[in-house]
């Protein structure tokens, strides 16, 4: 039963969150987890012949927080329900619970980006996408505007050091259903769908290998967000309790120690439990929103 549940939870379409996540961690308690972000030293000064080395300016730091929480619930079926189940729907309850767990985690990662949630740093609790972060636009998706948003990401500098450019490039584009065709034309087709330059309409974006990720449950018709390479800059952290990345399924019946409830009534109870937490994002510089 557990294997069937986990197989449904691991369906490919529910695993896109892993692509944009930079850290999957093991959390051993329910206390607040603290994550530090440090600035850089920038450009080192020249030391002339015979001169002493001067102290560098120490990088500043920020602290972000998150915690894991339990998610889950109970489902109970009776002997009569099971006997009358002509189409086997009740026997698929474990798979459906696995699907629910997968959907829960999927949305926990993508919801903060959709909702433009507030950051959790000690000195920055503004929204992810703001003019102050230089990562927020309201531009319809086309070649010229796509180029503008990419340049927004390229222009990001390190925390605490405006002279240190992070050299970010988009690796993914998150988008709503309504933009699937436009996104396909921009990032996968050899020729552009609209005039943009004088280079015989060749699609200059294609060489960057930007991968589209369609988020079907987002209700906007215009939203698209660029995501940098999670191996280059921290994006999102997902922490699992004791490193257990799979939901847990428990079955209570007479054979499995169901207790008086199962003894007094002919029924079987399922309990699903899933413990995790999400820090999204770790660094707002890793995301650039083109439209809401």
What are these language model-derived features?
Residues 1-71:
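Assembly/oligomerization interface modules of large self-assembling protein complexes
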Residues 31-37, 57, 113-120, 216-221, ...:
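Noncatalytic linker/hinge segments flanking ATPase motor cores
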Residues 131-140, 144, 148-158, 171-172, ...:
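Sequence/fold signature of self-assembling virion shell proteins
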